[in-house]
Amino acid sequence: YLSHPNMQTPKSGKIYSCNEGAFNSFPEPVKQYINHCKDNNYSGRYIGSFVADFHRNLFKGGIFLYPQTKKDKQGKLRLMYECNPLAFIAEQSGGMATDGINRIMEITPTHIHQRVPLFIGSEEMVSKAKMFIEAYEAEQPQEEVNQTSKA
């Protein structure tokens, strides 16, 4: 039973959802993207429930991001049973889901509890976050890029 048949996620939105309490431990390009959101008067909405935050952004347009941090260097959310199911829903409704670079649905798991960073929601917003990450990595010497992707 679908509550909203043929649902489509807006291509863009004005909501970003992330735990800003961890802002200081986010990679630099993620900080830049969040500052971009603030500079453009996007609304920060984060209640700490992945499914609830994703659901709101699915209907209203927005991005949910849970990047890697200094503490969780590979990300915190599990690929197989947290990221993949919602990435499937996002893509089926016209949205997008990446680990910052790679499409979530194309990541081959290395183990059942594998953790990954997640950027999921409206296509234009996820693409913009990905652009910030790619631009930052392109500017860095190769050894720093390797540290950034692991930090």
Model regions and ranges:
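IMPase-like, lithium-sensitive Mg2+-dependent phosphomonoesterase catalytic core
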Residues: 1-151
